[in-house]
Amino acid sequence: FKVSVDAEGFQFPSAIAFVPDPGDGPDDPLYFVTELRGKVKVVTNDRTVHTFAEDFFKLKPEEELPSFSGETGLAGICLDPVNGYVFVTFAYQDENNILRNNMVRFESEPGTFSLKAKSATPFTDIFVDVPTTPSHQIGPCQVYDNTVFVTLGDGHSFLKSRDVDSILGKVLRMTPDGKPVTSNPFYVDDDIKKPRNYVWAYGFRNPFSLKVVDGRVFVADNGLSSDRFLEARKGVDYLWDGSNWSIGVNADFVINPSVGTVQMDYYPESLEIFPEEYRGRFYLVM
């Protein structure tokens, strides 16, 4: 393998999402990059970097990276090519400077997307009732089968992680319009203010990596002295209780000592660019 620079000029890039079937023109979007402090960039086929969206939330950390308080901001991005939606997740400061989670859906050109967002739809009401904390905030998102999965850290409150009436420490599933999915395991009605309507799986500490493969949901959950990789099954409690040992519960693989995974992807067996021994595998970024 060889590492090379594909595009540059980013400030604290935090997530990336590739257009599944990009256009052929030099100015057609190829992939999107989020910057931690609040800009969404789009890179075109000719490797020009454009600003797709900015100034859609307020955040002024007490200290900049590598300080703990500087870890907060724009965290995840996922694409819905059928509808031309670009979803981004982030933590922001409200009018009282309280840190909260949120998600915004940007409307773009279906299929190939566009260089600028046409409009924006915030999903604030789903998340606004519960404050969050630096680093244990909302995480990545993933579009699958006309639904959107999104992870949330426990906000440094392990008791809320295992409470299905809290959004913290969860994998959530919603429609592209931000509504609950009726087949979610704890769904009771369409009330967007009831966290249990959205819960797919629970009992996580800081699930900052997410990938859906053939309908199976995989998560890397950052722990105290160890991390875990697992399949997040529908309705299952992953038992984070504030202790080191609980991170190993229900894990498919334990990473010890902790490395703090921040991104994850899966390379399918059907793609032949990688050598055969590297296909059909997950890749975690630490």
Labelled PLM ranges:
Residues F1-L159, S209-V212, R216-N222, D227-F229, ...:
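Acidic, Gly/Ser/Thr-rich repeat motifs that build Ca2+-stabilized beta-propeller blades
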Residues D165-M174, S183-D214, F218:
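Loop-centered beta-sheet repeat module
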Residues Q142-V148, M174-T182:
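A structural motif
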Residues S157-S166, D237:
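Acidic/polar, solvent-exposed loop segments in beta-strand-rich repeat domains
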Residues F1-K2, R47-F52, F106-T124, K179-R196, ...:
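Beta-strand initiation motifs
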Residues S157-K160, K194-A201, F208, I247-I255:
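Active-site rim elements
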Residues G235-V236, G280:
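Glycine-centered loop/turn motifs
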Residues R100-S114, V164-D177, E231-K234:
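Beta-propeller blade signature
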